Amino acid sequence: MSFSALVPFLSIVVPMREGVPAQWLEALRRVQGDVEFILVYPPSAQLEKIADERLLQLVSPFRGEIAQRLTGLLNASGRYVLTFNCDELIHPEVPELARRYFEQFPDSWVMRLSKEEFPYGNTAALNAPWEALPENLAALPICRQADGNLALYESGHMLEIPIAPMHNRFDWKCWWRGRRDHQGPHAENFDKKVWVNEKVQATLQEILPGLGLVGPVKYLPFWCLDRLLGLALQAKFYDAARPKQVIGHKLPRPALLRVEDNPPEFRRRARFYLFAEIILLRRFPQYGYIWNLIVHQIREFPVRAMSAVKRRLVAG
């Protein structure tokens, strides 16, 4: 995909659900800068009547956070793209901050948002005034991978994000102790980060054919696109000559995203990603890092399955 001067700087994609409070939509529309909002609703949902030329409302052919997110991403026209959820609040100045970041770090692929998490129902903290953001990001101290001290991030350093170590060899020990090469400052997930959209669109075209199983039968990763897309992008653009390439930074506080915990009746559960990551393996079988991930998921399958059965028995 090529971009002209007429396209928005940032596309913000949000999968929607029924009953999103009007206050959330009002907060979203307070976001400043050259931005397009792509709100993607489940089938048969009623669209909001909002007069805002920055707003594009779509209806996904399938219900589900990830199916809706995928629909939005395929329609994103901005130079950069960001996804988050419809129960999360974003700092109004994020688009302009992202502009400054990519001007000052033009080789970066990704800017990871700092976030603050709150217990369910803490509306006072969620709606508190936002803090001022730095003008010159290049003047911030940087926590580099070579420093070997990730704690520097907590003291106000920007954290370097190296590319995922795709070159790692397959580790047979994953079968009995699980994988360990996921630990470190690199990122696996796609969500809550500002990405170069040209790379995102190229990666989507890379993985979409992998959704085909047998003939017309398709597999749609209803809850697994996050890590699938994040790692597929890094695998597609991985340069073996630069195994420690820095592809972006995680910004320090103040928080750019506020995340409210789920209500007690909808507590977060561990999700099983294997089927989505088989798509990743089919496309990039040459990387040991992905094999380690797959083996770890296979190893976890009995535990996750037993936990799911136990929850159903308790609920029933």
Question: Residue spans of the language-model regions?
Answer:
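Short, well-formed alpha-helical segments that are part of the catalytic scaffolds
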Residues: 13-33
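Glycine-rich, basic loop-to-helix element that forms the pyrophosphate-binding segment
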Residues: 60-76
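Short aromatic/hydrophobic "clamp" motif used to bind/position activated sugar donors
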Residues: 81
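Acidic donor-binding/catalytic loop of UDP-sugar-dependent glycosyltransferases
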Residues: 88-101
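Short beta-strand-to-loop element that shapes/binds the nucleotide-sugar donor at the catalytic cleft/hinge
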Residues: 111-140
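Active-site donor/metal-binding and catalytic loop motifs
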Residues: 118, 188-194, 198-223, 234-266
